[in-house]
């Protein structure tokens, strides 16, 4: 039998509930995801891939040090695409794997965010000659996107286009 801190410690005052029900986000330092993505877009518009990589890797470490899991997921999503464009296969797959783990840890399965992770991971698979795996990931994204997005949403068009390319790679017309 083990003792938990609440078995032998007392809260600061009788009405302080944070001792028994701590706020999970109390010590989280959130990264400015919108600013990170805006700066990334600027760097990519100048085709400065090395700077974009440094930028994203810096913010990934900031998110991890600050305990910002959602920020970490956002940066990993961007890194998947950047590593893919740079031809960094191992880094791209590592980012995809970590993003999948975060989707599970944050209980985001079945969400638009989860679908976007699937889509980005699928493009990584497609880029590095794994079209069968890519098609499976695209199918996961498709089932979520079709449930939540309106028919004219551009994300659906992009998904269908990418799925078609995977089908062509597999000679499944």
Regions found by a protein language model. Give the residues of each.
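Conserved alpha-helical positions within TPR/SEL1-like repeat arrays
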Residues: 34-45, 71-85, 112-127, 154-169
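Amphipathic alpha-helical segments of tetratricopeptide repeats
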Residues: 60-62, 100-105, 142-147
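Short coil/turn linkers that connect adjacent helices within long alpha-helical scaffolds
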Residues: 26-27, 65-68, 105-109, 147-151
């Amino acid at each position: 039998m083990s003792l938990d801190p609440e078995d032998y410690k007392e809260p600061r005052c009788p009405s302080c509930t944070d001792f028994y029900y701590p706020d999970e986000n109390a010590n989280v330092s959130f990264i400015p995801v919108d600013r990170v993505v805006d700066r990334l877009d600027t760097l990519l518009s100048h085709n400065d891939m090395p700077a974009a990589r440094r930028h994203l890797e810096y913010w990934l470490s900031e998110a991890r040090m600050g305990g910002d899991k959602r920020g970490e997921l956002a940066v990993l999503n961007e890194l998947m695409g950047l590593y893919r464009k740079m031809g960094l296969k191992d880094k791209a797959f590592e980012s995809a794997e970590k993003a999948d783990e975060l989707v599970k840890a944050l209980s985001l399965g079945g969400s638009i965010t989860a679908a976007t992770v699937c889509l980005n991971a699928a493009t990584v698979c497609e880029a590095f000659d794994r079209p069968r795996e890519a098609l499976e990931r695209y199918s996961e994204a498709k089932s979520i996107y079709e449930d939540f997005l309106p028919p004219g949403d551009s994300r659906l068009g992009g998904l269908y286009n990418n799925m078609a390319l995977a089908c062509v790679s597999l000679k499944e017309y």
